Amino acid sequence: MDYRKYHAGYGTESTFADMLRDKSVSEGDIKSWQSGLPDFATEKADVRAKLVEWQTSWMKDYGVDYFRVDTVKHVDSTTWAALKNSTTEVNPSFKMIGEYYGAGYASNGSTLGTGQMDADLDFDFNDQATSFVSGNISSVESFLSSRNAALNNAYMTGQFLSSHDEDGFKASLM
């Protein structure tokens, strides 16, 4: 399941008023409204607990067995660890792959190997794939060897080529 944990969606301020951050406060990636969307105050224990309860109920009610987590850097690490702990209580093999924009195997926003995410999307892979089809096979092989040496069962990446947020992989080849 693809989801965002940090905001409630446009037009939902009155529904979730007691769970949202103050719109006038702007404190970096975690404590600011992003793109004008009402932001859950995930650093508050009661808000965190309610969100985790909702998300684990999706697992129980609908058989969700993994989350592809959007915009990981907009939620505090305590919340990610709480969600991961709760999901593995329901299903020990539950997995979460995070989208931490700009992350790669060498720079992942400290979400891997910390009990938060099982994997992050590897944004460096896009450049490597472009380099590969451009004929730079040796440099890509070197990158992949280094990346593979760094990965293990608690520190994994998923190949990332493009998304709705940027030009597609094929566009970079034209």
Question: Predicted regions: what is each one?
Answer:
Residues 1-62, 82-98, 106-107, 130-131:
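Substrate-binding/active-site clefts of carbohydrate-active enzymes
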Residues 53-162, 166, 170-174:
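Active-site-proximal helices and loops of the catalytic beta/alpha 8
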